[in-house]
Every structure is written in C-alpha cells, then in structure tokens.
C-alpha cells in the first residue's frame, strides 16, 4: 500500500501561488509512488479556533465536522507537506489556525515545508519549523520559492526549472524520512 502524504495549503486566496503550485506538488508526490491527500485551507471551512478546551488537553475531541476531517487527514498521513505563503514575513493566519486546532495529530510526523513569496518564504519557514517542533512534529525539509525568480505570482514555474527541482528534492527527503 502506498504511503499517504497530506498536503496542507496555506492561502485563502482563490488565485494564490499555492493554488498554482498544488498540482505540481501533487504530481511529484504521485511520481514518487505515494498518495497525495489535500487539506485545502480555502475550502476546508475551518472555523477560527474557538473551543473551550485546548487541543493539548487529555481527551480533546473537536466537535466541528470540518475540524474532524482535517484532524483525520493529518492523523492518518504518513507525512505532511505544508504549502505556505509568506505574508509580511509570517506564515498565513489561515494555516496557523488549522495548525492550532490539532495537537496529538502532529506528534512524530515528518513534515516538509514549501514556502513561497518575494523572499522565498524564509520568515514563514522559520515560524513553521519552530511551531511544528513545539507540537513534536519532525520538520525534515524546507524549500523556498521566490516570486519572479522561481515561480510567477500565480504559482506557475518559470523556465529555470528551479521550482520542480526544489519540490522533487523535498519529496525525496520526505520519502527517506518516513
């Protein structure tokens, strides 16, 4: 049975670079003989975190069906890829909210980060690595893609081939880390 990689997007924008990159990431996962499952933040309908209990509390079980679906996808994945934009040097609030809804689901999960933006998503990468380590996940690889150098602002790869190379390198690292 092929390994399952969950890809968690990070932008609510319908024309985001992440939406443009997602098919390339999915294809690269499938080319590595793995299954790609997507948690699309834009369509997942996750509410802002508003539970009276924290996910780190013993016995926490979210009651919202959208959160339950997200939790199940993360919990059953063999590894994850965080496809995240960088907004003002930070990870997106929508992706942070999705992360905040979960706790034990992240434990010991290998995670790769594909960040994108004007500065290759370095600020978002650093935040995600720190946050994922705090949640006891295993961030094992990160790649940054720069607008107008590696990808267009809509996520289309530029002729350099850097985007595809970076994504393939990240996925190969994840395969070794599972």
Regions found by a protein language model. Name each.
Residues 132, 136, 171-178:
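Structural signal for hydrophobic packing residues in well-ordered secondary-structure cores
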Residues 92-108:
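Rossmann-fold NAD(P) dinucleotide-binding segment
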Residues 4, 106-108, 155:
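Glycine-rich NAD(P)-binding loop of Rossmann-like domains
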């Amino acid at each position: 049975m092929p390994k399952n990689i969950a890809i968690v997007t990070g932008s609510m924008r319908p024309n985001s670079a992440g939406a443009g990159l997602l098919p390339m990431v999915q294809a690269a996962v499938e080319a590595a003989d793995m299954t790609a499952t997507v948690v699309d933040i834009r369509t997942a309908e996750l509410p802002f975190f508003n539970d009276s209990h924290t996910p780190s509390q013993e016995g926490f079980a979210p009651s919202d069906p959208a959160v339950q679906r997200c939790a199940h996808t993360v919990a059953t994945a063999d590894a994850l890829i965080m496809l995240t934009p960088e907004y003002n040097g930070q990870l997106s609030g929508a992706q942070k909210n999705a992360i905040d809804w979960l706790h034990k689901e992240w434990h010991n999960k290998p995670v790769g980060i594909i960040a994108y933006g004007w500065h290759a998503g370095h600020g978002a990468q650093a935040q995600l690595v720190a946050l994922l380590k705090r949640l006891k996940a295993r961030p094992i690889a990160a790649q940054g893609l720069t607008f107008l150098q590696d990808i267009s602002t809509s996520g289309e790869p530029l002729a350099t081939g850097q985007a595809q190379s970076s994504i393939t390198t990240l996925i190969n690292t994840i395969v070794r880390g599972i």
